[in-house]
Swiss-Prot record:
Its EC number is 2.4.1.-. One of its GO terms (biological process) is cell wall organization. Belongs to the glycosyltransferase 2 family. Plant cellulose synthase-like D subfamily. It is a multi-pass membrane protein. GO terms for cellular component: Golgi apparatus; Golgi membrane. InterPro entries: Cellulose_synth (IPR005150), Nucleotide-diphossugar_trans (IPR029044), Znf_RING/FYVE/PHD (IPR013083). It is found in: Golgi apparatus membrane. It comes from Arabidopsis thaliana (Mouse-ear cress). This is Cellulose synthase-like protein D4. It comes from the Eukaryota. Residues 1-26, 175-202 are annotated as: Disordered.
Length: 1111
């Protein structure tokens, strides 16, 4: 279904007389699918090396469904879905995903009791609660293969000899009498005209109208897809239940979920005053400098005044947005009371929190170790949030089998790790970080079995790491064995057909999965349709959606007793979007947009949290912290919550300012008081509706049209320019994706539990269980990750992550702010997320180069803040303008760093003499700088050493990476030269003797040339001036000190760079000192020969003395 044209898809949906077709096929070694009849299928297992597929042609309908819903979901979760451009979407049923055994009932490949068919040793599938899946009402136990055979032959159940029917005996009809309905019931006119106003509205052509939710529906909403209760569930009972839920909420004293805490006036008032004072002093100083040129060295004066004017402008752009810093706090107890507490209308305490989809992206398992990614996934699966509301998606842009099987191993290990974390309240929930803690693990632990459980889980984790580390060799050995078998088969066939035995056998070197079938993604030996840039779309539900009710473990199932612990796991999906030559894949932004579409169809969480593969959840309550802002009064106009980035593995001195606390604790906190922090690429919780490119709601305007504040709104209410004909142009032709948009919008609203909440949803709206997955839904999600789906749509232009820049994160956040949304900065007491950062000098410079290049691209694009709309606040506009301009400071910074050396070489200075006026201005500017630094340290919480490290790195990166970024950006604009970057290598967390080994590795790069030249020239200039001074008959030391001071100031900023060049202490190559000394002596002798000392007369005239006088 997913590969058919969109219009065909709609027509098929309306054909209620057709059932789902299951098509068997054999995949040959060449990659073709050959249809098989029943007579050609041998039950001896000869197909073990080929694909056994069923092709989804027609979705099941309420009138003709081949098996029970939960049974179908189980079969779907055990299938690897593939598809894409000009290919049919296929579901490959897998006997096993990994070589090791699978025990958790939610995981693909989980087996139940034995099959009841004669001469069959297969196992029955398990549902999410560990019970056997039986497709027929007679409860006849049948395995997957026998069920497929029965379906293909007669369609009859082998037990009762009846046709497979709708029904799952384990399912109970949901009871909505408690009032837990998402929206008020439709009006009587709608219920009375079922023929004219059908739930499945059709357009004039008789096709399914995929815009019904966007423009005409006043239906109810559930978690995931839309849920319409039965007609008899509407009426007085429902109304009373709804009113009861509202009354219960209204009776409780209203408390806010978050608070805005202003900076104390004793700190912020002097800070603002100093900014004004320094601005005034700077203006007077620059005026004085312009009016008092140095006639003896006009070229030196002109260069210095141009640089100083730019520095003043740059300082204004950086400092003015810091006028309004704020702090925020959250109240998790209030969140729990509002959304998770039992009540008369919710006796089981089912959560009313909205769902959230967590995205993790990876691209190359060689540079991003699978163990690091697996630990990130485990921290997500163990997050403290309602299990049924969490869905995790991994985007593998490389399509590597190594990543696939590593994620399957992580899902298997989560069966033990996640319940262990819940049972003993473990923090952090990244196993590698937890077992690496240098503190007493028994601190604050009171359960008597903790030590025993920890010992067991540590052993299991060690075995898990060994399995992950052994995956490359395991895959290689497996593939070699299967390829050798295929070569022998091909050779045998060639001999039987009479071919020339001397000719080499041409069999592709395929990569094979654990169940003995070809991997549809990238092969180790890349071939056509199996390389990083050319492979089919792949989607595997590693962990199917959990049940709505807790699944309590027991002491017999696991190595650890979980008899009082919920053992459910969140849904986990592996996604590798389709890539084909000739299609622009748009790097990480394209991968994120593919996840947005796939997740909208599978889970449709109204909020999305994206993480890099090396950033894990350090605070298991981080999601709840973010929800306190989204669900609070006024939270409906928040587009995203940005969490600060914190890093591990940084050297104690933070030589290269990796922690970047000045930015994360200073600039971002200040922007939070304006319109919100910028999006920095990871650790961000998005509102899905904002990602779709819509404007924020205007409650006053919307309430003029709506009678009820909790009534469903149409998309045209948010975007008047969006009509029916523009919907496919903006979002594509996916019907399910279009239907999910207003559902996500509604579920993302705050509770309407306060009169001030003008735009909310009723309490209890999100307690409805989610719909199970079916083949049609998963096939549609494969369709939307195809390479052609975004053609002629607004994905990447207005919708989703924005394309066109290597820093797509900043542009995406800018677009949201430009539409009027605001963002919030969430700093928690315990770090929410932690990740790794490059501590090697060269890697750090390349990282900054990528960021700066993206800023230059922004400056030369339509995303320049100068062109922003009126919805972007003035201070926010200055902040975004600074984002695009700051790399250009490098042009003036490099020149200014050479000025002290030019002064010492020429004997002149930027001013004629060190007059009282110059010194007073210099002193006042310095005092203001120190005062601003001290006060900024006070309100931001950073340290003075961190502030100084940031200043040092600003000069180092400004004279290297930023300069190269400007050159690359200009070349791209003028000559159209595209910019490409290699993926930053992540640390694999190996147990090295020195965890800071990368810090001492010297990797040569052209980015090092400018700082080296600056340092050498200033050192030589000091040496030359020193030698010239001592050769004078009457040495003028004051002149030397005055000129050398500014050179030493430059060298002090370059000190971390010099340490990075020296590598490990005591291992500096001798040749470096030899050449440095020779160069210095040569230049000194050359300068002495060109400008020799002429004796006392020359000294009296000040020849070679530095060119300026102390007053």
């Amino acid at each position: 279904m997913a590969s058919t044209p969109p219009q065909t898809s709609k027509k098929v949906r309306n054909n209620s007389g057709s059932g789902q077709t299951v098509k068997f096929a054999r995949r040959t070694s060449s990659g073709r699918y050959v249809s098989l009849s029943r007579d050609n299928i041998e039950l001896s297992g000869e197909l073990s090396g080929d694909y056994s597929n069923y092709t989804v042609h027609i979705p099941p309908t309420p009138d003709n469904q081949p098996m029970a819903t939960k049974a179908e979901e189980q079969y779907v979760s055990n299938s690897l879905f593939t598809g894409g451009f000009n290919s049919v979407t296929r579901a490959h049923l897998m006997d096993k995903v990994i070589d090791s055994d699978v025990t958790h009932p939610q995981m693909a490949g989980a087996k139940g009791s034995s099959c009841a068919m004669p001469a069959c040793d297969g196992n029955v599938m398990k549902d999410e609660r560990g019970k056997d899946v039986m497709p027929c009402e007679c409860r006849f136990k049948i395995c997957r293969d026998c069920f497929m055979d029965a379906q293909k032959e007669t369609g009859l159940c082998p037990g009762c000899k009846e046709q497979y029917k709708i029904g799952d005996l384990d399912d109970d009809t949901p009871d909505y009498s408690s009032g837990a309905l998402p929206l008020p019931a439709p009006g009587k006119d709608q219920r009375g005209n079922n023929n004219n106003m059908s739930m499945m509205k059709r357009n004039q052509n008789g096709e399914f109208d995929h815009n019904r939710w966007l423009f005409e529906t006043q239906g109810t909403y559930g978690y995931g897809n839309a849920y319409w209760p039965q007609d008899e569930m509407y009426g007085d009972d429902m109304d009373e239940g709804m009113r009861g839920g509202m009354v219960e909420t209204a009776d409780k004293p209203w408390r806010p979920l978050s608070r805005r805490i202003p900076i104390p006036a004793a700190i912020i008032s002097p800070y603002r005053l100093l900014i004004v004072i320094r601005f005034v002093v700077l203006c007077f100083f620059l005026t004085w400098r312009i009016r008092n040129p140095n006639e003896d060295a006009i070229w030196l004066w002109l260069m210095s005044i141009i640089c100083e004017l730019w520095f003043g402008f740059s300082w204004i752009l950086d400092q003015i947005p810091k006028l309004c810093p704020i702090n925020r706090s959250t109240d998790l107890e209030v969140l729990r009371d509002k959304f998770d507490m039992p009540s008369p209308s919710n006796p089981t305490g089912r959560s009313d929190l909205p769902g959230i989809d967590l995205f993790v992206s990876t691209a190359d398992p060689e540079k991003e170790p699978p163990l690091v990614t697996a630990n990130t996934i485990l921290s997500i699966l163990a997050v403290d949030y309602p299990v049924e509301k969490v869905s995790c998606y991994l985007s593998d842009d490389g399509g590597a089998l190594l990543s696939f099987e590593a994620m399957a191993e992580a899902a298997s290990f989560a069966d033990l790790w996640v319940p262990f974390c819940r049972k003993h309240n473990i923090e952090p929930r990244n196993p590698d970080s937890y077992f690496s803690l240098k503190i007493d693990p028994t601190k604050n632990k009171s359960r008597i079995d903790f030590v025993k459980d920890r010992r067991k889980i540590k052993r299991e984790y060690d075995e898990f790491k060994v399995r992950i580390n052994g995956l490359p060799d395991s895959i290689r050995r497996r593939s070699d064995a299967f390829n050798a078998r295929e070569e022998m088969k091909a050779l045998k066939q060639m001999r039987e057909s009479g071919g020339d035995p001397t000719e080499p056998v041409k069999v592709p070197k395929a990569t094979w999965m654990a169940d003995g079938t070809h991997w549809p993604g990238t092969w180790a030996a890349s071939t056509r349709e199996h390389s990083k840039g050319d492979h089919a779309g792949i989607l595997q539900v590693m962990l199917k959606p959990p049940s709505s009710d807790p699944l309590i473990g027991n002491s017999d199932d696991k190595v650890i007793d979980f008899s009082d612990t919920d053992t459910r796991l969140p849904m986990f999906v592996y996604v590798s979007r389709e890539k084909r030559p000739g299609y622009d894949h748009n790097k990480k932004a394209g991968a994120m947009n593919a996840l947005v579409r796939a997740s909208a169809i599978l889970s449709n969480g109204p909020f999305i949290l994206n993480l890099d593969c090396d950033h894990y959840i350090y605070n298991c309550k981080a999601v709840r912290e973010g929800m306190c802002f989204m669900m609070d009064r006024g939270g409906e106009d928040i587009c995203y919550i940005q969490f600060p980035q914190r890093f591990e593995g940084i050297d104690p001195s933070d030589r290269y300012a990796n922690n970047n606390t000045v930015f994360f604790d200073g600039n971002m906190r200040a922007l939070d008081g304006v319109q919100g922090p910028v999006y920095v690429g990871t650790g961000t919780m998005f509102r899905r509706f904002a990602l779709y490119g819509f404007d924020p709601p205007n409650p006053d305007k919307l309430l003029e049209k709506k009678e009820s504040e909790t009534e469903a709104l149409t998309t045209s209410d948010f975007d008047p320019d969006l009509d029916v004909t523009q919907l496919p142009k903006r979002f594509g032709n996916s019907t399910l994706l279009a239907e999910s948009i207003p559902i996500a919008e509604f579920q993302g609203r705050p509770l309407a539990d306060h009169p001030a909440v003008k735009y909310g949803r009723p309490p209890g709206a999100l307690r409805v269980p989610r719909d199970p997955l079916d083949a049609t839904t998963v096939a549609e999600s494969v369709s939307v990750i195809s390479c052609w789906y975004e053609d002629k749509t607004e994905w990447g232009d207005r919708v989703g992550w924005i394309y066109g820049s290597v820093t797509e994160d900043v542009v995406t956040g800018y677009r949201m702010h430009n539409r009027g949304w605001r963002s919030v900065y969430c700093i928690t007491k315990r770090d929410s997320f932690r990740g790794s950062a490059p501590i090697n000098l060269t890697d750090r410079l390349h990282q900054v180069l990528r960021w700066a290049t993206g800023s230059v691209e922004i400056f030369f694009s339509r995303n320049n803040a100068i062109l922003a709309s009126k919805r972007l606040k003035f201070l926010q506009r200055l902040a975004y303008l600074n984002v695009g301009i700051y790399p250009f400071t490098s042009l003036f910074l490099i020149l200014y760093c050479f000025l002290p050396a030019f002064s010492l070489f020429s004997g002149q200075f930027i001013v004629r003499t060190l007059s009282i006026s110059f010194l007073v201005y210099l002193l006042m500017i310095t005092i203001c700088l120190i005062g601003l630094a001290v006060l900024e340290v006070k309100w931001s919480g950073i340290g003075l050493e961190e502030w100084w490290r940031n200043e040092q790195w600003w000069l180092i990166s400004g004279t290297s990476s930023h300069l190269y970024a400007v050159v690359q950006g200009v070349l791209k604009v003028i000559a159209g030269i595209e910019i490409s970057f290699t993926l930053t290598t992540k640390s694999g967390g190996d147990d090295n003797e020195d965890i800071y080994a990368d810090l001492y590795i010297v990797k040569w790069s052209s980015l090092m040339i400018p700082p080296i030249v600056i340092a050498m020239v200033n050192i030589i200039a000091i040496v030359v001036a020193f030698i010239r001074t001592i050769y004078q008959a009457v040495p003028q030391w004051s002149k030397l000190i005055g000129g050398a001071f500014f050179s030493f100031w430059v060298l002090a900023h370059l000190y971390p760079f010099a340490k990075g060049l020296m590598g490990r202490r005591g291992k500096t190559p001798t040749i470096v000192f030899v050449w440095a000394g020779l160069i210095a002596i040569t230049i000194s002798l050359l300068w002495t020969a060109i400008n020799p000392n002429t004796g006392p007369a020359a000294a009296a005239e000040g020849v070679g003395g530095g060119g300026f006088q102390f007053p």
